């Protein structure tokens, strides 16, 4: 058999496809990250070893702020290239919608790295607006106000505008115009009004229904005309400065984007012909991330276009429409939060143990005294070959079903059942291996890989750290971060440590396609085996829930300084005490209750005084400990 190489691992896990030049495999067989343009490589295994020395254990979220900087710069440079190519005379504004990841350390890094590109922020709720107004220090950066709004929301936005913030209030529903007029009159402010338009065009992929006629937000063309009449009646003609549209997140097909842009451009042209000097067009989100690295529109986890192609289409469409109608080019806004933030975070989890289906030892031979079903199944196993494979598969299934029925009726004993089950799974393994060499695998054999896969139990909560994997079957690239110079000999699915059968992952990127199993290595004694889950920087942290009371994981910010990595900040994961407090348990009261119970048990002679002290000490220490296994 050919010796396994690093190149084989690169191909198997398709790291060159989804890694987007940020991730690779070094000569040691470890995954590295290259956050900066100077190509400094940071070994993820080295980071985990250093964190372990600091008593920071997996699961841990590794954030690389330099990647945020690179993603912002890449988007801005794509606009600059498009500007030069198409003669675009407007300004472009990169906006980060904080709903993508509202964690203060992440937003702080984005603002810091985005200053040189005048990056703005978007708020979609009242709490988000409170955060955005306070952290966005640059007065010339845009703040876009989306989502449902009440009077206090609009008052906060207009007061901030009055004090110098560059704020646009985007009307999602007609009644919001009345609130804006009321508050603006009270504050004596001339509001910057935007209108979200409900396009007929829709996106593609998991969020296609975010656009089109079924979309939740936006005004139809008829409602837009009603809104324009209201604007005239209110004396806000000059206040309408922006139109906004959004056809969905993670748009997989560039053609859908092109269609939406052409439709939106006509709204821009028509509004100008009606006398409205709209000077901003907010193209919303939708710029996708290639999670599986296939660059295919047929996959909901991929996209068939680049950032440059997306930007080119945005710029060209509005330049072309404006030029043909002798209208000024609009200032273009993009809200591409997923594209900006997905790559910068890697979740590292450790494998606790594995479980596999029982198999019969190769040296086993059926004896005359064995049950007839054992002898029949042994004969099938002993004579398996490609010609009779499917017939043998059917016979083996029938024997197993019969054995289970006989066991339920007390006719077959436990030893016989165990032998038949182990031999059945051995037959399945051999049939699966034979099927891999067939040009056309029978339909009923195609699911054997998944059925026969080992279970790798990992120290994390799917619901806390990868909620989209559970909720919408979002695919994330997953692979070992070490031993990649070794052949992975086990096929596995991943199980989390929650008490929920949904807490598993059984869809993976392998060999450039989506598979039901992940090739992994056997565990080694006293050696941690780490898996990296990549591209998790968008939505996952903020959408995570506390199923089984597993809290936020440890997190670390790692940057490059003078050609070496530096762990800038460490954020401890939530403790048992903190998560109990979320669900309204008072930890101090819990301790007092335990003290009373232990005192009573000591007095009754059930435990000794020392045992009582040890129990209370263990309990108190546990309250301040990590919610995950240590």
Where on the chain are the PLM-derived regions?
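Short, glycine-/Ser/Thr-/acidic-enriched flexible segments
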Residues: 30, 38, 67, 101-103, ...
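Active-site-proximal beta-alpha core segment in soluble small-molecule metabolic enzymes
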Residues: 87-282, 289, 293, 304-309, ...
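Flexible, glycine/charged-enriched surface loops at secondary-structure junctions
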Residues: 58, 62, 84-89, 274-278, ...
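A non-catalytic, amphipathic alpha-helix used as a structural packing/dimerization or gating element
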Residues: 66-74, 226, 263, 313
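Charged, compositionally biased N-terminal leader segments and the immediate start
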Residues: 1-31
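Helical (often loop-to-helix) elements that flank the catalytic cores of nucleotide-handling enzymes
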Residues: 299-314, 363
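Charged (often Lys/Glu-rich) extended helix/loop segments that serve as interaction or gating elements
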Residues: 313, 319-630
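Low-complexity, highly charged intrinsically disordered N-terminal segments
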Residues: 20, 25-102
């Amino acid at each position: 058999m050919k010796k396994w190489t690093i190149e084989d691992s690169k191909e198997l896990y398709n790291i060159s496809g989804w890694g987007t030049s940020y991730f690779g495999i070094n000569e040691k067989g470890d995954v590295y990250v290259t956050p900066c343009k100077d190509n400094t490589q940071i070994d993820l295994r080295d980071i985990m070893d250093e964190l372990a020395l600091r008593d920071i254990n997996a699961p841990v979220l590794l954030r690389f702020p330099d990647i945020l900087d690179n993603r912002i710069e890449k988007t801005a440079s794509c606009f600059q290239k498009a500007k030069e190519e198409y003669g675009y005379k407007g300004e472009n504004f990169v906006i980060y919608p904080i709903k993508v990841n509202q964690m203060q350390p992440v937003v702080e890094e984005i603002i810091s790295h985005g200053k040189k590109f005048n990056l703005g922020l978007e708020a979609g709720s009242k709490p988000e607006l409170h955060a955005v107004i306070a952290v966005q220090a640059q007065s010339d950066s845009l703040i876009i106000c989306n989502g449902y709004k009440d009077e206090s929301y609009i008052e906060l936005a207009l007061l901030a505008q009055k004090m110098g913030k560059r704020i646009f209030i985007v009307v999602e529903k007609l009644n919001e115009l009345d609130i804006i007029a009321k508050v603006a009159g009270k504050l004596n402010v001339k509001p910057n009004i935007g209108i979200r338009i409900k396009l007929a065009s829709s996106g593609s992929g998991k969020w296609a229904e975010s656009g089109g006629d079924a979309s939740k937000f936006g005004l139809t063309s008829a409602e837009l005309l009603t809104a324009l009449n209201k604007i005239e009646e209110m004396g806000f003609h000059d206040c309408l400065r922006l139109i906004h549209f959004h056809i969905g997140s993670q748009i997989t097909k560039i053609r859908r984007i092109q269609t939406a842009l052409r439709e939106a451009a006509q709204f821009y042209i028509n509004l100008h012909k009606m006398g409205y000097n709209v000077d901003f067009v907010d193209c919303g989100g939708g710029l996708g991330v290639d999670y599986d690295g296939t660059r295919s529109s047929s996959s909901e986890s991929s996209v068939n276009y680049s950032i440059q192609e997306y930007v080119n289409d945005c710029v060209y469409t509005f330049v072309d429409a404006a030029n043909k109608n002798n209208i000024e080019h609009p200032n273009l806004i993009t809200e591409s939060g997923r594209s900006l933030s997905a790559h910068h975070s890697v979740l590292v989890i450790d494998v606790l143990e594995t479980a596999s289906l029982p198999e019969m030892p190769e040296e086993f031979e059926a004896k005359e005294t064995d049950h007839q079903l054992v002898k029949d199944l042994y004969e099938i196993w002993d004579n398996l070959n490609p010609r009779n494979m499917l017939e043998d598969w059917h016979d083996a299934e029938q024997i197993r079903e019969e054995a289970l029925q006989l066991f339920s009726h007390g006719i077959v004993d436990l030893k016989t059942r165990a032998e038949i089950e182990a031999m059945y799974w051995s037959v399945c393994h051999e049939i699966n291996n034979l099927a891999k060499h067939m040009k056309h695998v029978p339909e009923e054999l195609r699911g054997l890989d998944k059925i026969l896969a080992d279970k790798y139990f990992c120290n994390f909560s799917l619901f806390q750290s990868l909620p989209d994997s559970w909720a919408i079957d979002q695919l994330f690239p997953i692979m070992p971060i070490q031993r990649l110079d070794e052949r992975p000999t086990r096929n596995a699915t991943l199980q989390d440590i929650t008490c929920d059968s949904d807490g598993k992952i059984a869809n993976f990127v392998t060999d450039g396609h989506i598979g039901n199993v992940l090739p992994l290595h056997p565990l080694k004694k006293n050696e941690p085996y780490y898996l990296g889950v990549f591209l998790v920087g968008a939505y996952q942290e903020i959408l995570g829930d506390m199923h089984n009371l597993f809290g936020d994981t440890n997190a670390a910010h790692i940057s490059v300084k003078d050609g070496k990595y530096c762990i800038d900040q460490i954020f401890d994961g939530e403790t048992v005490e903190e998560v109990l407090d979320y669900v309204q348990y008072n930890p101090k009261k819990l301790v007092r209750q335990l003290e009373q119970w232990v005192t009573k048990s000591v007095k009754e002679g059930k435990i000794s005084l020392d045992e009582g002290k040890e129990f209370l000490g263990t309990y108190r220490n546990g309250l301040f400990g990590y919610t995950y296994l240590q």
